[in-house]
Amino acid sequence: MTPKLVVFDLDFTLWDAAGTWCDHLNPPFEIVSGRIFDSMRAELKLYPGTIDILEELKHECIDIGIASRTGEPEWAKELLNLLNVREYFRYEEIYPGSKITHFKRLRNKSGLNYEDMIFFDDEPRNITEVSELGVKCILVKKGISPEVVRSYLTSR
């Protein structure tokens, strides 16, 4: 069954924050020649194919959400804006704490059942706890790729 809501974590899933988490970067952030850097020249970038996946989901009328436990939610939102991808996300749950809380709020806001959601994250603990809700969870090791996301969108 095709999911009605695809949810992504941010760090190590949608983007690479110079090999760390976005809340370990050093603002202010700036764009230089189309690339995003923090004040220490650490670069943040989307994983290859991320825009393609977001465009495909949008084209298929599948809602997209974020579930991130970052300690600096405003930095994450600023980076989403600088990357020009924030417009793709209908739902944003970006704050510290358990991903269980993120998904309860996603369910309440969307009106969808957990079984209608799919979640991509790089941390096994998040995959374990969210899957207990009934959400289909996929562990990604080094960021999402179009091939991985597509394979779960079409699997029955």
Where are these regions (language model features)?
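Asp-based phosphoryl-transfer active-site loop
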Residues: 2-19
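Acidic, Mg2+-coordinating phosphoryl-transfer loop and its flanking beta/alpha structural elements
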Residues: 114-155
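Surface-exposed amphipathic alpha-helices with a cationic face
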Residues: 54-59, 107, 127, 131
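Metal-dependent phosphoesterase signature
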Residues: 16-48
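Short beta->alpha linker loops
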Residues: 49, 70-71, 97-98, 122, ...
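Substrate-recognition "cap/lid" segment bordering the active-site pocket of phosphatases
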Residues: 67-118
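Conserved Rossmann-like nucleotide-cofactor binding loop
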Residues: 13, 20, 72, 125, ...
